[in-house]
């Protein structure tokens, strides 16, 4: 295992900058926010630790990238920033997300509520769910894993056409595996930062995807018609578990972070670290490091205290209700399904420690 440690001065410069204007901006932050963010360069901090690499196949080793500090983020002329008329994140589900309509509806509300807390201060809205056939995307059966896959680039074109006027971005989510081009095996997600759209699949986050008993394999490899989407009818969907929900929330917020202009983090253990495989993605924390937190706060303008409180409320709320963020049709059940948040409990304890620092 390799540990990537930066010097105190390197981390301090990455967070605060040496640009007098940006230093002045930092000094105007709430005292508690400065106290929390300063944990970035405290060697003994138990809130923010170094990045650990476990194998040569990990992202940083296999995909060398230039690091992005706060000043580089702030000065990037191409990054997207929400405007008064474009402060909504839209989520578009493609295909069913659960084994029943009710489970599917609850799952999308859980994910929506999480995004609403994570990107605190922005509106998060749902577009009406659509079947795969509505996208007119290309699809195939993967030659190695024998599961169905839909073409990510085609979905991005579909989302771009559906993008509402007040949208900062539109993100599609699906339980069907994705591929970006014929020569690729798969991709977890793909985004167009210019167009403000992204598509992300949670198919490989089910506990059984890589097992011999995976039920999503198409038994007969036959040439499928490009216009016959009936193959997706009643296609296998993994069980919605706490781990799958955590992985879904982690991936979705990471990828939306890219749409804001946050590049892969190479400073500290952080949600914005790249991941090359599921084991590495599971190691990546749910939280942003102080450098990436400052970037997101700069883009949205939230109170860090209120954002963390909103995340704790999302974990604590047994109800899945997300007022104002559900499609107009109603559920047929008499109550909400319990939200499986067991996997988030450790992170809740971490947030409470951060709130203690913020509110000293």
Swiss-Prot record:
Q: Which UniProt keywords apply?
A: Hydrolase, Metal-binding, Metalloprotease, Protease, Zinc
SUPFAM superfamilies in alphabetical order: Metalloproteases ('zincins'), catalytic domain (SSF55486)
What does this protein's record comment on cofactor binding? Binds 2 Zn(2+) ions per subunit. One is catalytic, whereas the other seems to have a structural role.
Q: Where are the transmembrane segments?
A: none
Ligand binding (Zn(2+) 1): 254, 258, 264
Q: Which PANTHER family match?
A: ARCHAEMETZINCIN-2, ARCHAEMETZINCIN-2-RELATED
Q: What does this protein do?
A: Probable zinc metalloprotease.
Q: Write down what this protein is called.
A: Archaemetzincin-2
Organism from which the protein derives = Pongo abelii (Sumatran orangutan)
Cite the source lineage.
Eukaryota, Metazoa, Chordata, Craniata, Vertebrata
